[in-house]
Amino acid sequence: MSTTSPGRRPPFRRWIHSGIALGFAGALLAPSTALAGEAVASAAVTGEVPRSDPMGGPAAVAGRQVISGSMFYPRIPRAYWRDRLKKARAMGLNTIETYAFWNVHERAPGTFDFTGQNDIAEFIREAAEEGLMVIVRPGPYVCAEWDWGGLPPWLNKDPQMVVRSQYPGFMAAAQRYLNALAKEVAPLQKTNGGPVIGIQVENEYGSYGEDHAYMEAMRAAFVRAGFSPRLLFTADGPDLLQRGALPDLPVALNFAPGSAKGAFAALEKFRPGAPIFVGEYWDGWFDHWGAKRETRDGTAMAAELKQMLEAGASVNLYMFTGGTSFGWMAGANAAGANADHTTGAKVNYEPDVTSYDYDSPLSEDGRVTPKFFAFRDAIQSVTGEALPPVPQDPGTITLAPIALGKGQSLWSRLPAPVATGSEVPPTMEDVGQSYGYILYRTKLGEGAEHPVDLVLPEVRAYAAIYLDGVFQGAIDRRLKQTTLTLASVKRGATLSILVENTGRVNYGPALPGERAGLVGAPKLDGRTLSGWSTYSLPMNPPPKVTAKGACEGPCFYKASFEVERAGDTFLDTAGLSKGVVFVNGHNLGRYWNVGPQRTLYLPGAFLKPGRNEILVFDLYGRPGLRVEGLAKAELGAEPKVDPHSAQAR
């Protein structure tokens, strides 16, 4: 029980400006009994959208101070959900917050999946069984360092598509998704006696636009789908509230450590007397390929967390546990003045690593950290609650080196092309592909005995280039490259461009134009190249490979290994170059020797006693490759230069 009564504003602490009257307004709405008289049904008849209360919010719905942490169900193996939830409760949390991810639930238009790893309703039920309330953030856009912010790539098959807008094609697709999601989540809302106390509309829209008519339309879509209008709220940075908020919805504040005082003052100025709900308190940060590891000390954050809770604020820690962006789901940032969809390769593109450890209180593999105990002490000092004991950390195993001696070349197992004779290479979206790799081939009509420039106007996002199967170099969007000089070319030679989608941009103005593959027509020596054949290589499910012998270049390597018992381990990819790993059919995600991430998390839940299968696709394969399983993660290796793209510009 909080030391702050829900029905009373606590006195201001000295760290908050004395002239501001802030506080906790948990009783501005009564608990669930007062919410039972929803007007949703009548709204469906009249077409009116039931109003909410700008002085409400999750704490008002819950009738108590909310102490929450973020944990996203697709990033944690389902077998481990309960372990993580128990640890959340043991740290002193009373609520779990999660996004819902449109792209994993609707991989193809109109086809929905809420089973297995995607069973959000079961995730919510398990949280409730562990004594936790739940906040759900359905998006439709979620950011989250997730490919395209959770938007499904098939949206961009419509050449007129404008996401996060009132464009009819977007709103119709979003409504269909929200309808399906609400069937899973709405029965679990507090208004129906369930644990869900908050539903966020959109996500930090103020950092993207200020079309309030769009936000009104999106709110109406939520209500039509069946989400309770009393549970709805928006979230933005403190300086962007005016752009993203709606006048009658509660607002949440998202900000970095050390910013609480200014953020609370901004909220008071924007909406005097409003209850304080911190939607995201960034207790860590994410990492980019080729950059240094990000960490944040927990001592000062624990002190600020205590101050916020003492001031009566409800707080969500982003993240409680980060987990892993398994498969192709890691996204990318596009920072800087050129970050818009018209500048293409000039965008400051920063792809995210596979690990979403986030330096959070609970590590990628669910281990408690010093930050966990610092936050636990801070929370308990305010609530006085007797907390459950901290569950034991999961056991780890090591794996002896696994030789990847036998492989099969990508060139020997290409599928039939999905498009031929194209004047301009189609993007992944154009051919109905979402993730993985895509190959473009054409025969050169003219040769040259002198150096010539191959120009790819926009690479999304990493292109390996070959002439008659011989590697020439790579062009990396991350390095703002567009051009590779070829020493010479023969007439009739086959030019192959193998493009990896290393993650669509998930944040910022570059969002609308995000497509994967090649965008625009390549040129060689100033002449536009045409006659392209396109090969779709989604690698989902993982391909069936016949590994017969040594292999170089883009190769699949297949091997088996034995374990006596299943346990978590970390595959050391230091000897590999760039690619992806599958174990027993599970895509562990991308690796890249530019760092800082060196190990891929292999959950024990993906293993079985006895024989296990590993499949590695390495873009720059060579004989003698091997991997081994370590007992600890290595996420802070020194960044390196990619030698394969060193000659491009």
Language-model regions: role of each:
Residues 450-466, 495, 561-584, 591-592, ...:
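Aromatic-lined ligand-binding clefts that engage carbohydrates, nucleic acids, or primary amines
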Residues 37-95, 125:
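N-terminal carbohydrate-binding accessory modules
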Residues 119-136, 159-196:
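An active-site-proximal structural segment forming one wall of the substrate-binding cleft
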Residues 225, 229, 256-363, 367, ...:
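Catalytic-core region of carbohydrate-active enzymes that cleave or remodel glycosidic bonds
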Residues 66-77, 102-118, 156-176, 200-211, ...:
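The substrate-binding groove and active-site-proximal loops of carbohydrate-active enzymes
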Residues 170-246:
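Active-site neighborhood of glycoside hydrolase catalytic domains
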Residues 110-116, 129, 140-165, 215-219, ...:
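Aromatic- and acidic-residue-enriched segments that line the glycan-binding/catalytic groove
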Residues 81-147, 219-224:
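Aromatic-lined substrate-binding rim segments of carbohydrate-active enzymes
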